């Protein structure tokens, strides 16, 4: 598309593996054309406010990140509906690559990329599939912060709870609300100066006000066309698609190798490991079925 002189809006994920996406980013840079990603969840007022508060620095440094995102429940019928679905050769991954690209993008957009990942990706844990449907990942950041990312397509009912612990409080995004547990003083300073062994800083809970806007796909499309016409900002630059995929690939690679993986990781090694699984990927016949997708996106 870039070689044909076209502007490009890419749906998530940007690709299956980062080496592939890096080539796309290079083609975009050479073309001089507008390149955007369909990261519509960045338009959600709650996540925009989290991004503003965390990156703005008013709450201090990140200490801990926790995201439980398990409200992706899928039946066996869902996986049987396509011969490509949930196969290494056809899709290249499971819940990390299909359901979680938006959350992995938001995680890195709000908190940044970790420096190290240790993940446990359970393949076919809840379904008769060859790719992962249950993942628990431990993250380490450059400043010493840690995190846990949990996802699954086997939990009913599922959970979507995103917590960011910072020096001046904690943000909790859940049930379409953003709560701030605001501390009266910096926890790190309090820890060093408090005289009582069981003292804790004073805390007040408040629901964070937002602008209430959540334009989703329309917002991304409007920003894309406005950028082409007027040069105004995109919701997400296309080159950023590689960042969430970096997290996904690092989790896969860590699980395959059974040890922590540093970011950036060896992209050639990742592709080598993926191709091993592609070669043994099983062929399956799809079931002819029609789904009601209301409320699934």
Give the residues covered by each predicted segment.
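Beta-strand-loop-alpha-helix segment that lines the small-molecule cofactor/substrate pocket
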Residues: 1-42, 57
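Structural detector of well-ordered beta-strand residues that form the stable sheet scaffold
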Residues: 9, 34-36, 66, 118, ...
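Aromatic/hydrophobic pocket-lining residues that form π-stacking "cages" and hydrophobic walls in ligand
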Residues: 24, 50, 250-251
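Predominantly a Rossmann-like dinucleotide-binding segment in NAD(P)-dependent oxidoreductases
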Residues: 41-128, 258
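Glycine-rich phosphate/pyrophosphate-binding beta-alpha loops
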Residues: 101, 126, 150-158
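Active-site beta-strand termini and strand-to-loop segments that position acidic
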Residues: 132, 137-143, 164-166
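C-terminal glycine/acidic-rich active-site capping loop/insertion
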Residues: 141, 166-239, 261, 272-297
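A contiguous, mid-protein "functional segment" used to position or interact
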Residues: 235-272
